[in-house]
């Protein structure tokens, strides 16, 4: 994804993200992320960890794009759904599909649709 972006808007977005919890979603599933961080503004790069024990771990390894959904402090129920071992998490939350067929959760603080830049296999 090579769309132009506003660095100041991206910086403001990261600055207002206080909960530290978000949900990564694909076309068919997702999981709770509590390690999401901005790595670079130019180029825009983000970083997060996926545990190998995560239900959707293998499917995320083969993705070209996905979404990060920023949760509000009152959305613990959504965080818990995506932290579970349930194999049909998306059916339990309101969402829509983007033009790239990526599920985006409704009523969150916001979302980013991202493409994979690099994957590093380190540990569990």
Residue map of PLM features:
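Active-site-proximal mixed secondary-structure blocks
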Residues: 1-124
């Amino acid at each position: 994804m090579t769309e132009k972006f506003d660095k100041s808007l991206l910086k403001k977005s990261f600055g207002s993200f206080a909960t530290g919890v978000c949900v990564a979603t694909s076309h068919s599933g997702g999981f709770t992320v509590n390690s999401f961080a901005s790595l670079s503004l130019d180029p825009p790069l983000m970083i997060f960890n996926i545990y190998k024990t995560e239900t959707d771990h293998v499917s995320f390894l083969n993705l070209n794009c996905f979404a990060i959904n920023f949760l509000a402090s009152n959305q613990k129920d959504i965080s818990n759904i995506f932290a579970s071992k349930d194999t049909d998490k998306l059916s339990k939350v309101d969402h829509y599909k983007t033009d790239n067929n990526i599920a985006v959760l409704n009523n969150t603080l916001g979302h980013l649709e991202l493409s994979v830049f690099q994957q590093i296999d380190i540990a569990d």
